[in-house]
Amino acid sequence: MQLFLLSNLYIIMQTTVSLGIDIGGTNIAFGIIDKSGNCLANGSLPTTAYNTPQDFVQDLYKTVKKELDNLDVQLVGIGVGAPNGNYFNGTIENAANLSWKGTIPMVELLTKQFGVPAFITNDAKAAAIGEMVYGGAKGMKDFVVITLGTGLGSGIVINGKLVYGHDGLAGEVGDRKSVV
């Protein structure tokens, strides 16, 4: 935290951070990240420990709040990568590798609990963004990232832009019907 004096008025400048969440079929990893991309704190929670996404969000909030208080930082946003994460709808849609069934309004749940904007995308698309900004695809305009974990997915980048498709599900390969 920085403290500035401006005509007998103190202004407190608190470091701002984002929360990154990777929801997987086995574990949910999270990290508190500063503006430079440094991970200030991280952890994981077992996905199967939560009967509902609401239970998960409440437990995540308690865990992250402690870290934010210890670091004396201000959370300004949340980014989520999840199987069948739909960027357009803010939902996780019928993910075969999660025990939570149906359409889950994850962005709504996180925004309500944390009080900051949240965004979601498919976990493989999030991996493609990570590779484009920090990893092996840095400087590349066209590439595909294929992920294999509890599920199978891909993130497609064409001309430096992530491809979402008309419904937000472009690149989903793990639980889609395929013609061979």
Residue ranges of predicted features:
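Short glycine/serine/threonine-rich phosphate/pyrophosphate-binding segments
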Residues: 27-29, 126-128, 151-153
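Cationic, low-complexity basic patches in intrinsically disordered or flexible, solvent-exposed regions
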Residues: 2-3
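Short glycine-rich anion-binding loops that position phosphate/pyrophosphate groups of nucleotides
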Residues: 83-86, 149-151
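Glycine-rich phosphate-binding loop and adjoining helix at the ATP-binding site
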Residues: 49, 53-65, 74-78, 84-142
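Glycine/GP-enriched mid-protein hinge/lid loop-to-helix segment characteristic of carbohydrate kinases
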Residues: 15-17, 31-33, 41-44, 48-53, ...
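Intrinsic-disorder-associated, low-complexity terminal segments enriched in Asp/Asn/His/Tyr and depleted
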Residues: 8-10
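Conserved phosphate-binding loops in N-terminal lobes of ATP-dependent enzymes
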Residues: 15-82
